[in-house]
UniProtKB/Swiss-Prot annotation:
It comes from Photobacterium profundum (strain SS9). Siroheme binds at residue 476. Keywords: 4Fe-4S, Amino-acid biosynthesis, Cysteine biosynthesis, Heme, Iron, Iron-sulfur, Metal-binding, NADP, Oxidoreductase. Its cofactor is siroheme; [4Fe-4S] cluster. The gene is cysI. This is Sulfite reductase [NADPH] hemoprotein beta-component.
Length: 563
């Protein structure tokens, strides 16, 4: 690190007394519905973001009222597994104690509560704690929720991978007692807080980790700082290939920021997993940029110091030498919607949840439907990184019962197209303070329009496009790994990126900047027309746009993304 002035977030963390700040005092202040000064940032380390309802912000200002401050909470659920008992408890809390009455499944393979007012925040944490859930470190400059491929078919392998996701999450978790003290009325103990892995100033920026079972890339490895690719021998997990330095966030107009693929460091046996995880995190802790938060993520550290230098430091700290990577291949990222049978004879029902939003609407009481399933289900639920929900471990005798509940509540709809199943958006308006354009509320009608274009050009149901919309350049909707990625620029305007591929191993490049939705549809119409007429046999849309020179491929992000 060069000696530059540290960002103010570094002061904030240093002075926070291991993430306590004055959050407890702020909770008692009912003059404002929000958190003040440093606490606005510090609550992120406890899994919350302060938000407000942007649909009514101007009206409240007219009435001389502050914005309707509330928090969004993101739960820590390594691997996305939740029991029916836990589900019924979160369903009840969302219904009774949040402004929107919904549960939002997210691209981080967990659930979010939106619209929780200050008087209900402590109740929320205590409710979660009573069912064995917390939200420690799901936001802020820490290792966040650890993702794991939801592979219900290879049940034994999935169980092993899931156990590692949990172990990695626990190993990298903050050790401060602040969460228990503030939210769970834990006993205050003077001194003694230590953070051997994260350090007293925590990480320079957010850090994301996955465990993935090829050939499924449902967790999108290249969106994450640290990835453990499961390598199996005769169905048994023997170790991991380690990929480091992925990430999708960027800043509009700042060409020192860009999405980037992760680099393959090599193979490690299982016994070295936790040491390597800690070594990658501590190297980024010590070498990451603490002066400019826009360049603070692991991907920029790798590009600044060099992949080989970073890798050698990880080897030194972990006391290992990476072996050559073992062969693997990604073939798909989508969830297998519908029923599948695992090798253990259990059945699993993957439900497509558009945008991950579980809410009761006229004719589609989705949230109630999942709760009704939870009342009789003997297995567990698995949230996916594609914002869907798997009813897992269903005995053959219960299949018909569970399918009937799902159909009666609109959770199974045979009319949903493959295109819709392969489309995704982040939350954006009205709750996300960073959103520049609509995403979740925009996507359903946009997909309908794209379906019309595909039909117009005579394309079959299987001929669909990985389509993603994100409301700003931070990339929660993972548009920077889509075949067509829309990035919000202003209300009704988006940058359009082309050239990603179906298995999520290529970053798309900007094709059109700051254009309106009608202009976007014109562009898609022309592009799909060309694809239908000029493609090679079975050629996917993203590969077609690269092969025909419509867009140049991004091979090295730092060099190619803006070229």
């Amino acid at each position: 690190m060069t000696e530059q002035k540290l960002s103010d977030n570094e002061r904030l963390k240093r002075e926070s007394n291991f993430l306590r700040g004055t959050i407890a005092d702020d909770l008692q202040d009912r003059i404002t519905g929000g958190f003040t000064a440093d606490n606005f940032q510090l609550i992120r380390f406890h899994g919350m973001y302060q938000q407000d309802d942007r649909d009514i912000r101007a009206e409240r200002a007219k009435q001389k009222l502050e914005p309707l401050h509330n928090v969004m909470l993101r739960a820590r659920m390594p691997g996305g597994i939740i029991t029916p008992t836990q589900w019924l408890a979160i369903d009840k809390f969302a219904e009774e104690s949040s402004l929107y009455g919904s549960i939002r499944l997210t691209t981080r393979q967990t659930f979010q509560f939106h619209g929780v007012l200050k008087p209900n925040i402590k109740l929320m944490h205590q409710t979660l704690n009573s069912i064995g859930i917390d939200s420690i470190a799901t936001a802020g400059d820490v290792n966040r929720n650890v993702l794991c491929t939801t592979n219900p078919i290879e049940s034994e392998l999935h169980q092993e991978a899931y156990e590692w996701a949990k172990k990695i999450s626990e190993h990298l978790l903050p050790k401060t007692r602040a969460y228990a003290e503030i939210w769970l009325d834990g006993e205050k103990v003077e001194g003694g807080d230590e953070e051997p892995i994260l350090g007293s100033n925590y990480l320079p920026r957010k850090f994301k980790t996955t465990v993935v079972i090829p050939p499924q890339n449902d967790v999108d490895v290249h969106a994450n700082d640290l990835n453990f690719i499961a390598i199996a021998d005769n169905g048994k997990l023997v170790g991991f290939n380690v990929l480091v330095g992925g990430g999708l966030a960027m800043t509009h107009g700042d060409k020192t920021t860009y999405p980037r693929r992760a680099d393959d460091f090599g193979f490690i046996p299982l016994v070295n997993t936790l040491e390597v995880a800690a070594a990658v995190v501590t190297t980024q802790r010590d070498w990451g940029n603490r002066s400019n938060r826009k360049n603070a993520k692991t991907k920029y550290t790798l590009d600044r110091v060099g992949v080989d230098v970073f890798k050698a430091e990880v080897e030194k700290r972990a006391g290992i030498t990476f072996e050559a990577s073992r062969p693997y291949e990604f073939t798909d990222r989508g969830d297998r919607i519908g029923w599948v049978e695992g090798i253990d004879g259990k059945h699993h029902l993957a439900l497509f949840i558009e945008n991950g939003r579980l809410l009761d609407t006229p004719g589609k009481p989705l949230k109630t439907g999942v709760a009704e399933i939870a009342k009789i289900h003997k297995g567990d639920f698995r949230m996916t990184a594609n914002q869907n929900l798997i009813v897992a471990g269903v005995p053959a005798a219960d299949k018909n019962k569970i399918e009937k509940i799902a159909r009666d509540h609109g959770l199974i709809d045979d009319g949903v197209s493959e295109q819709r199943k392969n489309s995704m958006a982040c939350v954006a308006f009205p709750t996300c303070p960073l959103a520049m354009a609509e995403a979740e509320r925009f996507l359903p009608d946009f997909v309908t329009d794209v379906e019309g274009v595909l039909a117009k050009h005579g394309l079959a149901e299987d001929d669909n496009i990985i389509l993603r919309v994100t409301g700003c350049a931070n990339g929660c909707g993972r548009a920077m790994l889509a075949e067509i990625g829309l990035v919000g620029k202003a209300p009704g305007r988006y940058n359009v990126h082309l050239g990603g591929n179906r298995n999520g191993t290529r970053v798309p490049k900007m094709y059109r900047e700051n254009i309106t939705v009608p202009q976007i549809m014109d562009e898609i119409d022309q592009l799909v027309g060309r694809w239908a007429n000029e493609r090679e046999d079975g050629e996917d849309f993203g590969d077609f746009t690269v092969r025909t020179g419509i867009i140049e491929p991004v091979l090295v992000s730092k060099r190619d993304f803006y070229a």
